[in-house]
């Protein structure tokens, strides 16, 4: 396949699989990476007192949630938020973010070169904000 998309996959991939699809394997993660890698991201954001939380789409590498971040969508953490309320707002942004990144890839606008995200043939200094 030209692109493998992980969404809610919740499994560790083998190094051979990741290497085989290097640059063609993306994941959506419910935090503003590199902050709050792994599980329970909404709880972690609330416990840390974060003012902003969100979602990231990144290229998958051997490091868990450690690949180059392509794009992010932010949401405010509101007073009175609990995990469920925050998760619902983040999920809504994920549903906007992931199709946009897939479209950019399909249009040939997005690539990973030398471990760096390139958009419109230019290396990015940070994630695209959506």
What are these regions (language model features)?
Residues 3-120:
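Donor/substrate-binding cores of folate-linked one-carbon enzymes
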Residues 123-130:
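C-terminal accessory domains and tails appended to enzymatic cores
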């Amino acid at each position: 396949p030209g692109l493998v998309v992980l969404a809610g996959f919740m499994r560790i991939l083998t190094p051979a699989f990741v290497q085989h699809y290097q640059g063609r394997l993306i994941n959506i993660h419910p935090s503003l990476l590199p902050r709050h890698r792994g599980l329970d991201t909404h709880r972690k954001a609330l416990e840390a007192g974060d003012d902003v939380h969100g979602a990231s789409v990144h290229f998958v590498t051997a490091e868990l949630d450690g690949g180059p971040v392509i794009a992010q969508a932010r949401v405010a953490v509101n007073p009175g938020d609990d995990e469920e309320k925050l998760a619902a707002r983040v999920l809504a942004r994920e549903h906007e973010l992931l199709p946009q990144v897939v479209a950019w890839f399909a249009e040939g606008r997005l690539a990973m070169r030398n471990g760096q995200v390139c958009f419109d043939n230019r290396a990015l200094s940070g994630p695209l904000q959506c």
